[in-house]
UniProtKB/Swiss-Prot annotation:
The active site is located at the dimer interface. GO terms for molecular function: 4-hydroxythreonine-4-phosphate dehydrogenase activity; cobalt ion binding; magnesium ion binding; NAD binding; zinc ion binding. InterPro entries: PdxA, PdxA_fam. A divalent metal cation binds at residues 166, 211, 266. This is 4-hydroxythreonine-4-phosphate dehydrogenase. It comes from the Bacteria. Pathway: Cofactor biosynthesis; pyridoxine 5'-phosphate biosynthesis; pyridoxine 5'-phosphate from D-erythrose 4-phosphate: step 4/5. The lineage of its organism: Bacteria, Pseudomonadati, Pseudomonadota, Gammaproteobacteria, Enterobacterales. Keywords: Cobalt, Cytoplasm, Magnesium, Metal-binding, NAD, NADP, Oxidoreductase, Pyridoxine biosynthesis, Zinc. SUPFAM superfamilies: Isocitrate/Isopropylmalate dehydrogenase-like. Pfam families: PdxA. The gene is pdxA.
Length: 329
């Protein structure tokens, strides 16, 4: 890394395990400066509950970034709306969570931070606070005015991107259009090259229907939509294999010769990845004008403040973001 970079972290739902995980992250040295967008008392109280040392240093944007030393975090303060009891949701803190996301996103857009790592949020409490909220991915897409974003989850062994995300199953077929596939594959291909350092990405593409449509006998979306798009993009030089039946695609003879899989919908691709690497996975938002990674698990309210939360996914998300920073320099 040419110079030390700043990475901003949002712990997510304050009553959940996000603050625990951030405190655990602070127990080791990092080659980047970790700027945590959060309430100071929340972090120090959670550190005390866990019996872990934590010193908060003020964020100084005009000073050179410094590698993070063990037992410390750099704090960009955002005040809680209500006091927090670990494991107990408070509706007003839905506003607090969104404020942390907005500040972190804006800092990435204005060049303060090289990447953003997000902890788990509770979508229900944010919506209960009167803020329409579908998820991190959609929030950052809108705030950054990105034309289109793509959700990808990854472990060390497997990357799975989604053509559609949070749609009811009955709406998926209508959503799979030539325009959508062109856009999604272009973003996936571009970010695999620029953020992952893969010169010529090899992408496996799932069919939509069982057996990838069985030659049109089990649905015609492959023939009518997916195959023509893949043929066009192959003619432009992209290395695309598919559409392949999703029930047989996830095996070594295919995956060993691929850099990523494109699934047509959420529950087509993610169960395989989460079964293979739950707790080690990372959620990446492709298509944003900055690097964003996230844990692949929820708020786990019942574990908050107990010292039982596994920091593995957060560590993996941060390490991946650091690698992506290097690739983009």
């Amino acid at each position: 890394m040419v110079k030390t970079q700043r990475v901003v972290i949002t712990p997510g739902e304050p009553a959940g395990i996000g603050p625990d995980l951030v405190v655990q992250l602070a127990q080791r040295e990092w080659p980047v400066e970790l700027v945590v967008c959060a309430d100071a008392t929340l972090l120090t109280d959670r550190a005390a509950m866990l019996g872990l040392p934590l010193t908060l240093r003020p964020y100084s944007p005009n000073s050179p970034a410094q590698p993070q030393t063990a037992g410390t975090l750099t704090l960009l303060p955002v005040a809680l709306r209500e006091s927090v009891t670990a494991g107990q949701l408070a509706i007003e803190n839905g506003h607090y969570v969104v404020e942390t996301l907005a500040r972190a996103c804006d800092g990435c857009l204005n060049g303060e931070f090289a990447a953003l790592i997000t902890g788990p949020v509770h979508k229900g409490v944010i919506n209960d606070a009167g803020i329409p909220f579908t998820g991190h991915t959609e929030f950052f897409e809108e705030r950054s005015q990105a034309k289109k974003v793509v959700m990808m989850l990854a472990t060390e062994e497997l990357r799975v991107a989604l053509a559609t995300t949070h749609l009811p199953l009955r709406d998926i077929a209508d959503a799979i259009t030539p325009a959508l596939l062109h856009e999604v594959i272009a973003i996936l291909h571009h970010d695999l090259r620029t953020k992952f350092g893969i010169a010529e990405p090899r992408i496996l593409v799932c069919g939509l229907n069982p057996h990838a449509g069985e030659g049109g006998h089990m649905g015609t979306e492959e023939i009518d939509t997916i195959i023509p798009v893949l043929d066009e993009l192959r003619a432009q030089g992209m290395k695309l294999n598919g559409p392949l039946p999703a029930d047989t695609l996830f095996q070594p003879k295919y995956l060993d010769n691929a850099d990523a899989v494109l699934a047509m919908y959420h529950d087509q691709g993610l169960p395989v990845l989460k079964y293979q690497g739950f707790g080690r996975g990372v959620n990446i938002t492709l298509g944003l004008p900055f690097i964003r990674t996230s844990v692949d698990h929820g708020t786990a309210l019942e574990l908050a403040g107990r010292g039982e939360a596994d920091v593995g996914s957060f560590i993996t998300a941060l390490n991946l973001a650091i690698k992506m920073i290097v690739n983009t320099q």
